[in-house]
Regions:
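Long, charged/polar, soluble alpha-helical segments
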Residues: 1-127
């Protein structure tokens, strides 16, 4: 993998992980006025990393779908924790197993998009 790509991917994943750390540190997620923006930012950083990884490794036809875990039955905090775990796994696999790294990235994006959809349906208490 070209060093220029790996650094961009690592940076984007690290930013997303940092954002999820901040989300998890919130005492009451339902009252967090910045939750929507933070989730959007984490999802976009993850999407960007996935796009760069996909294009740099010819994975455009590979579209993994998260099926084993019923994410919708989890709390927002647990969903954020799961997304963070997927991102950390992706980062660990990046240099040695890019296809599996991409798979974990796509799973993280799916979890983050699920959280965003739930928040859209169920407004935050501060709204």
């Amino acid at each position: 993998m070209h060093a220029q790509y790996i650094l961009k991917i690592q940076n984007a994943i690290s930013i997303a992980i940092s954002i999820l750390d901040k989300i998890q540190a919130e005492q009451d997620l339902q009252k967090s006025s910045n939750l929507r923006e933070a989730l959007w930012h984490a999802a976009e950083e993850s999407e960007y990393a996935a796009a760069v990884l996909s294009l740099s490794h010819g994975l455009t036809d590979f579209d993994p779908e998260l099926r084993e875990i019923n994410v919708k039955k989890m709390t927002i905090r647990d969903q954020a924790r799961l997304a963070k775990t997927f991102l950390q796994d992706s980062l660990a696999l990046l240099g040695s197993k890019p296809k599996q790294s991409y798979e974990k990235l796509r799973y993280a994006v799916q979890v983050l998009r699920t959280i965003q959809a739930e928040i859209k349906r169920k407004p935050l208490e501060s709204d």
